[in-house]
UniProtKB/Swiss-Prot annotation:
Keywords per UniProt: Cell inner membrane, Cell membrane, Membrane, Multifunctional enzyme, NAD, Quinone, Translocase, Transport, Ubiquinone
The species this protein was found in: Escherichia coli O127:H6 (strain E2348/69 / EPEC)
UniProt function note: NDH-1 shuttles electrons from NADH, via FMN and iron-sulfur (Fe-S) centers, to quinones in the respiratory chain. The immediate electron acceptor for the enzyme in this species is believed to be ubiquinone. Couples the redox reaction to proton translocation (for every two electrons transferred, four hydrogen ions are translocated across the cytoplasmic membrane), and thus conserves the redox energy in a proton gradient.
One Gene Ontology molecular-function label: NADH dehydrogenase (ubiquinone) activity
Main localization category: membrane
Protein name: NADH-quinone oxidoreductase subunit C/D
Length: 600
């Protein structure tokens, strides 16, 4: 029998494991701290990964922040339990580790700093002295790993209830409910829970009144309609003026990152849809691309264009809901009902292509679930003919309304410096005049082949500017869809690669070896090489990213999900202090967030 199968394992992988020693920042660090001050880790993240000593963390961070082309944004910060990791060749000894992902806008480059920690000494200095947005990330890392950040202003739980015992992302913490004892709510425990819910301003970092003044404390949420989900903000008021406020999150926390450790690389795809439940396939994109980096898969051109098309459909769908609900929050009801008619047309198109509506789980490792159906182009053509006129009517009837402008212009305004300090991305960042959209700055899935513009504001990001940028982004998405319609490549909808999951069906019907592979990959899951990968995308609400660690298994060793809404809610107090409660409602409507994206 002649073997017609191609030996794809001998081909050049799509993503090389690199140490990035040629990146200028490595030379700058060595010149300042010496060649032996740190260990460079080779990964498939696409960015330099540098292990540094705990004692040098703040000095290195300050150095990077003050370079001629500085690393001005703390993009992400979290931890990892290294105790069960078997593939750690060449890395410093560590029971746990903390990573710091920094971005330089001027260089359009990133760097990841890592600090190794021993189990009996889980202490690291707080990064809040350099980047204020480290606050929530450090709280979450302590909450889920038990790593203490010395000097943190308010190191308390953020995802889990204050009475929770243990740190869920540790490897010795159960991942399934069946591993716990049955839940019992005794009278003593109920009293303890009620006591924990008692509001004490000093525990939230708020000051009580003095003899000459007193403040009112107001709960907004967690079930207020303008909170856009299970979200609570405690307001400290002097009359109608907001003196201070503290966002309270975690009500929607589902342990999505923990789930990644017990699902196969393939079976985790449906969970990605639900991280930001309005984004659909946009959420699948960074995860699938990160897994494909681990696997070394290059997908066909047709797959790239199909993925872009589905992503832009969901971007329009999300933006329509955002724009119409913002108008509703300001006080106009009608547009939200019209917008749902438009969104229904998108859902009909998505359902015709994928078989599902909100959460298709349609992208696959190495491709998409199936090819485009007959008639997809007609449905897309009808939508492209329909939408521009509708968008123009929303803008004319509502967004140019003088009352809406008066309620939103100049409200919750901030500049580029503040946006970068708080890790703001998406329209909130671009409204400050910074032209940074991942689709243009760091193209993925073939975005470099599309002709579209990035709307940018004039220097100040206020509620009105953020909304109007989203309107223009919607128009640009329509341009991209037009190009997808007119230039859809021919070819397969899956890559011809051993780790494509499920494998191309044609081979399973011809070769028993491929049928065996199909059985193993669908039942146990594909085995990804031990490595680390990272992928960021321009999601509907800002930059979303997946940082995956494989230990050579069928499941992820560590799945880190960085979402834009988390960073944007942390910024609320800095942007709204001194404003009125009514302004806060407008501000919340202008952020564009859903709590599943925040709490994961």
């Amino acid at each position: 029998m002649v073997n017609n199968m191609t030996d794809l394992t001998a081909q050049e992988p799509a993503w090389q494991t690199r140490d990035h020693l040629d990146d200028p920042v490595i030379g700058e660090l060595r010149n300042r701290f010496g060649p032996d001050a740190f260990t460079v880790q080779a990964t498939r993240t696409g960015v330099p990964v540098v292990w540094i000593k705990r004692e040098q963390l703040l000095e290195v961070g300050d150095f990077l922040k003050k370079l001629p082309k500085p690393y001005v944004m703390l993009f992400d910060l979290h931890g990892m339990d290294e105790r069960l990791r078997t593939h750690r060749e060449g890395l410093p000894a560590a029971d746990f580790s903390v990573f710091y992902h920094l971005i330089s806008i001027d260089r359009n480059r990133d760097i990841m700093l890592k600090v190794a920690l021993a189990e009996n000494d889980l202490h690291v200095p707080t990064f809040t002295k350099l980047f204020p947005n480290a606050n929530w990330y450090e709280r979450e890392t302590w909450d889920l790993f038990g790593i203490t950040f010395d000097g943190h202003p308010n190191l308390r739980r953020i995802m889990m209830p204050q009475t929770w015992k243990g740190h869920p992302l540790r490897k010795d913490y159960p991942a399934r409910a069946t591993e716990f004892s049955p839940f019992e709510l005794t009278k003593a425990k109920q009293d303890l829970e009620m006591e924990a819910l008692t509001f004490k301003p000093e525990e939230w970092g708020m000051k009580r009144g003095t003899e000459n003044e007193d403040f009112m404390f107001l709960n907004l949420g967690p079930n207020h309609p303008s909170a856009h989900g299970a979200f609570r903000i405690v307001l400290q008021l002097d009359g109608e003026e907001i003196v201070d406020c503290v966002p309270d999150i975690g009500y929607h926390h589902r342990g999505a990152e923990k789930m990644g450790e017990r699902q196969s690389w393939h079976s985790y795809i449906p969970y990605t849809d639900r991280i930001e439940y309005l984004g659909g396939c946009v959420n699948e994109m960074p995860y699938v691309l990160a897994v494909e980096k681990l696997a070394g898969i290059t997908v066909p051109d047709r797959v790239n264009v199909i993925r872009v098309m589905l992503s832009e459909l969901f971007r329009i769908n999300s933006h329509l809901l955002y724009i119409s609900t913002f108008i509703q929050d300001v006080g106009a009801m009608t547009p939200v009902f019209f917008a749902f008619t438009d969104r229904q047309k998108i859902y009909d198109l998505v359902e015709a292509i994928t078989g599902f509506r909100m959460h298709p789980a349609w992208f696959r490792i190495g491709g998409v679930a199936h090819d485009l159906p007959r008639g997809w182009d007609r449905l897309l053509r009808e939508f492209l003919d329909w939408m521009p006129k509708r968008l123009a009517s929303y803008e004319k009837a509502a967004l140019q309304n003088t009352i809406l402008k008066g309620r939103s212009q100049g409200v919750a305004a901030y500049g580029a410096k503040e946006a970068l300090e708080w890790g703001t991305t998406g329209a909130g960042l671009r409204a400050t005049g910074i032209d940074f959209d991942v689709r243009k700055a760091r193209p993925y899935s073939g975005y470099e082949n599309f002709d579209f513009e990035i709307p940018v504001g004039g220097g100040i990001s206020d509620c009105y500017t953020r909304v109007m940028l989203k309107v223009e982004e919607l128009r640009q998405s329509l341009r991209i869809l037009e190009q997808c319609l007119n230039n859809m490549p021919e070819g397969p909808f899956k890559a011809d690669h051993p780790l494509t999951t499920p494998p191309p069906k044609e081979r399973t019907l011809q070769h028993i070896e491929t049928l065996i592979t199909h059985f193993l990959q669908v039942s146990w899951g594909p085995v990804m090489p031990a490595n680390e990968s990272f992928q960021m995308v321009e999601a509907t609400k800002g930059i979303n990213s997946y940082y995956l660690t494989s230990d050579g298994s069928t499941m992820s060793y560590r799945t880190r999900i960085r979402t834009p809404s988390y960073a944007h809610l942390q910024q609320i107090p800095a942007a709204i202090r001194g404003s009125l409660v009514s302004d806060l409602i407008v501000y919340l409507g202008s952020i564009d967030f859903v709590m599943s994206d925040v709490d994961r």
